[in-house]
Amino acid sequence: MILLQHAGLPPPKRPSSSPPMSVAARSTGALQLPPQKPFGQEASLPLAGEEEPPKGGEQDTALEELCKPLYCKLCNVTLNSAQQAQAHYQGKNHGKKLRNYYAANSCPPPARMSNAVEAVAAPAVSVPPQMGSFKPGGRVILATENDYCKLCDASFSSPAVAQAHYQGKNHAKRLRLAEAQSNSFSDSSEVGQRRTRKEGNEYKMMPNRRNMYAVQNNSAGPYFNPRSRQRIPRDLAMCVTPSGQFYCSMCNVGAGEEVEFRQHLESKQHKSKVSEQRYRNEMENLGYV
């Protein structure tokens, strides 16, 4: 080695100290294995965000037509913003009506309805169609107080929103106005009934006044009877004077109307006079007088 260094020649290469590689190891090192996937992703399973294609395409398209971004035709609710629409479509009322819709059509509901709520930049609010044309399975779902206020013409997305509306000032003001209108209508109807009754009484009194004037103008002689056309009952025929008045000779009392005269006949004074007269007649018949 010293001689080689002096001569300027490079030293010979020494063999490496690592053991020789076996044939199996060489063959393994020569093969290129594919990169392994992390644990849990060996099988091609669908992720949580992915959705399976819905079954019953016709029914899903009909349901998407019912559930518009700002109008839910299934619940008959008009929505004002995308946040309110999202809250409505995720609420209990919409879920219940959705289950009823699928039950009426005898089709299992999907796990998730796609494209139900979409972000709308400039929504064009359209007039909702009439509910009479829509008949899902021949079943009509009526709106409740938690869905719609008929007095204020307002729709709600949840019972909490409905409760807040019913406790607000606007609803209370509308309620007071409605009560005032109903009271005024009832008062006006009562006044109208009173007027009709009064007019009827005045109309009845007018012919009587005309008859009185005619009697005064057409009276001729002391034997004129203005009640000649009036029907006189048989039991009172002997108590009517030629002038048409009723007269009680026993009590020396007269009356112009039949009702007043009958009241006199049923009075205690008249009955006492009648009993006295009977007693006198009986005594005369017996010869005591």
From Swiss-Prot:
It is found in: Nucleus; Nucleus, Nucleolus. The keyword Transmembrane helix does not apply. InterPro entries: Matrin/U1-like-C_Znf_C2H2, ZMAT3, Znf_C2H2_jaz, Znf_C2H2_sf, Znf_C2H2_type. Residues 9-18 have a biased composition (Pro residues). One of its GO terms (molecular function) is RNA binding. Keywords: Apoptosis, DNA damage, Growth regulation, Metal-binding, Nucleus, Protein transport, Repeat, RNA-binding, Translocation, Transport, Zinc, Zinc-finger. A zinc finger (Matrin-type) spans 70-100, 147-177, 246-276. It comes from the Eukaryota. Residues 180-191 have a biased composition (Polar residues). The keyword Transport applies. GO terms for biological process: apoptotic process; DNA damage response; protein transport. GO terms for cellular component: nucleolus. Residues 1-59, 180-200 are annotated as: Disordered. Disulfide bonds: none annotated. Acts as a bona fide target gene of p53/TP53. May play a role in the TP53-dependent growth regulatory pathway. May contribute to TP53-mediated apoptosis by regulation of TP53 expression and translocation to the nucleus and nucleolus. Interacts with dsRNA. This is Zinc finger matrin-type protein 3.
